[in-house]
Amino acid sequence: MQAQRLLMMTMAGALAAAMPATAQTIYPINRAEILEGSHFDFKVEFPNAPASADVNVTINGKPAAEIFGRPTNFIQSEEGQKHSALWLRGASLPAGSYTVEATQGTSKSTVKWEVFATAQPRRAKNVILFIGDGMSVANRTAARILAKGWEEGRYNGELAMDDMPNMALISTSGTDSIVTDSANAAHAYTTGHKSCVNALGVYCAKNALTLDHPKVETIAELAKRRTGMAVGVVTNSEIEDATPASMVAHTRRRSDYNDIVKMFYDVKPDVIMGGGSPNFLAKTTPGSKRTDGEDFIAKFKEAGYTLATTKAEMNAAAAAGTKKLLGLYNTGNIDGAFDLRLAKKGTLSKFPDQPDVVEQTKAAIDMLKGNPEGFLLMVESARIDKYSHSLDWERSVFDTIMLDNAVKVAKDFAGDRNDTLIIVVPDHAHPISIIGTYDDDRPGQLLRDKLGVYADSVPPNYGPVDAEGYPTKVDTSRRLAVVYGSYPDTCDTGRPAMDGERVPAVKGPDGKTNIANEKDCSGPLAARKTGNLPFDANSGVHSADDVILTAMGPGAEKFRGHKPNTYVFRVMAEALALGGK
């Protein structure tokens, strides 16, 4: 036995000696699908900081510089780190298949790229991309129940996003994790490249500074550079937040809000609407979050933008034929539909005239549609996700209904034009499910006593819906039983949080771990739940579940079966014929 162990150790040592050092890393990564003529940064990182004479990089067997038609830049010990780097910023390639090989001594790394062309003439004049942030299947189901009603096993109507001819399952994972965040998930839609958690418009390399990582061009930048299209970005989050920022940003850190504001200014989408005004304000302005002397409110005005800070100002700008609008309606996130329409909580006392996503969508289309070259519009219902993080499903579902109403606005605009591609897709899912209904008339003193499953899951008795499809009463005796599969220590009340967004957990006495919010635990039926997340978690998390995409218009027929999230970019780019040498 000892001899066998010695032999195995000897073989293992010999194998280790024969294996190459840590492999070189090539960006873009293996299996990248790159739009012909789009701009991207080419980078190869070599471990152990070799000299340029000790490495070689080829593309299809030829020197990289020859293929790109430009010299590359080699940096030994980049940023003083223990690696060297070969760079080419702003590269582009004609359509074709490419094999990239990076050699360092006996070590070699290989990646393959597909550079795809887009056919002319362009099929779509306009593209409207709706992103329901965190909108899981249960969100759509619950929205349909609340907005349309249910009777004898059938819904009494369809959602606007359901009534679309094309559908696909979309996988959302990033390069570094099975479960994505909103940054690299939205980045996949707007660039066609995979990336890592927290990244926007970049691959995640070893660079120390967040703005120095290898960049890839966004669809908004492409539309501005290659066409005369107008571009719009609409959200009810802070405009610098991950999803809207994915249209313009290039940073390894999604929280680089001040830099992202500058990136919005550099790209200059024609219509920009959301919250997050403090990062636009000059440092000397009370409430500013900027650390420099820039006043981006003034800069946008000088660039010809009208500023709107209320719904009334937004509508007046649209009615006046404004073509460039900067709409900043809250210092933080815009309040969701549940608070705007029903509970009247959130920040309404401070910002009483905030537009919702539906109103923003209508105003944006009115301002963009006059462009003879068409428009590209991204609309996000951001708080579907934020409320699911808070385990506040009623607010999350109200914002799903709101997104659906915005989709109806777009469908009404598209009508019979046959020139507008409309896509509705989440960026990722949450682990949320409907397991039955709670009925206060069921016997028992515990929340689980009130739960009806299977034959006992009788329909809820929410109040009548208003003209927009929102129930006018939700704190009723029979309610949907909606549960989340990820949660910190918390208490489930089984009822809507009418006094403000739910706070599932708070800091414990040690200041490190989180404990259940006793405010929720004091209710008569509250069920205390031991969390299933790490102890420092204070909210729910995303899931790796596939999400449902629905679409209509020119190019939508390409959505079928299962696709990676990067495919959404490809369909939009092909519909707009954005490729070219």
Kindly label every feature range from the protein language model.
Residues H193-M263, K268-P269, G276:
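Extracytoplasmic mature domains of secreted/periplasmic and thylakoid-lumen proteins
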Residues Q76-P94, W113-A117:
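Short, hydrophobic beta-strand segments
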